[in-house]
Each structure stands twice: as C-alpha cells, then as structure tokens.
Amino acid sequence: MLLLEAATRTGWIDRNQMVAPSEILAHVAAIIPSTHFVTDLTRTSVTILAAFALGVLGGVPLGVLLWRVRVIGRVLEPFIVTGYAMPTLLFYPILVAVLGLNAGPIVVIASTMALIPIALTTMVALGDVKPVLHKLARSVDASRRQQYFKVLFPAATPLIFPGIKLGFIYAVIGTIAMEFILASKGLGFRAGFMYRELYVADMWAYIAIVVVFSIAVNSALGLAERAIRRDML
C-alpha cells in the first residue's frame, strides 16, 4: 500500500488510471453517509445474496442428483460444463422480456453462474467419500436422511464448501458485471457511472467497497463451514 501510495503521488502511475489509497479511503468515507449509497448497497446486497441463495439451493441438490443417479450425471455433466463457459449475458434480452426490466434478470444470471460450480463440486465431493463410510452408515441401520446429514455431508464438507465459496464469488462477479453494464442502480452501476464520467477516485472507492463486502461475506462463510462441520459430527 505504501508503494502504491508513493507511486501515485509521484506520478509513476497515471492518476487517470489509479489514485492514491489514501484518496480512495477519503472518497469511501464521503460516499458511505450519502443517501444513494444506502440504496445502491441494498440493491447489490439483496441481488448478490438472492443469487447466491438460489445457487446453493439449486446447486447442492443438483450435485446430489448427478452423483446419486450416475446415468444422469454422465449425460448432464458435459452440458453443465459447457454452460459454465457460455457467456450468460447473451440470455439477458430473453430474461428482460420474461421478467421485466428489474433486478430479476440479474439474479437469474448471477445465480446460474453460482449454481454450476456448487453442483459440480458437490458431485465430486460426494463421489470422493470413502466406501467404508457408506458401509458404516448401513451397518448401524441409518435412515437415508441420517446417511446424508450424519455421514455423507460431514465427510464431503471440506470439498463442498470451497465450491460454495466459489459460487459466492461468481454471484458477486455476475451481479457487479451486470450492474456495471445494464442496471440503473447498485454498486456496480455506480462504479460504471463513475468510470464513464471519468471520476476515477469515486470509481475505485466503489470497487474498494465491493471488495470489502466480498471479503466479509467470504469470511462469514468460512465461520459457517466450521460451525456446520462441528454440528454435523
């Protein structure tokens, strides 16, 4: 940070591209009390969390299905991987026609981006559970629910949760990118507006806010992972 501060202050880095970290912090402090910041933060937070929740609620069961029914897994996995590489922005006009010009299309696109890595890692994680654990569950006459929640998911959690964290990252990327290009409110929209209007310091301030938000939620997911593993064992 000190090197970046010195480089921007001395002109080694073009101030039209990057400003000093101290200046970014000053702009963050000025932005946070503003009324439009609360609106933008609320819109982006709700969109990200909705997309992430849909990604988890859809991705984990899909991953279980792909693992449990091997035929479906073999058939669908190539299409899911292909969809992972497909630019989902192409579907935005269709989603606007169906859902309207609101946050709905952004939530759908961001949740799809989050769902795919969660589903794939869930499938792989359950497939890596040691066979002896399956035998153990059957030997104690565990119900199907007990097998999943007392044996399989605790054993697979170390691999599932990295996929969930990756899904959150993709939910953030999808939301911010879509807001940057297409939305009329949100942190991504505001950063894009500042970029187009050449307010470089404000643009970096909004980027810094998004980074801090992402780190905070990712840290919360790490705490949740440890709590869930402790409760499920």
Annotate each predicted stretch with a short phrase:
Residues 1-12:
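N-terminal signal-anchor transmembrane alpha helix
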Residues 81-117, 124-125:
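Generic hydrophobic transmembrane alpha-helix motif, especially the helices
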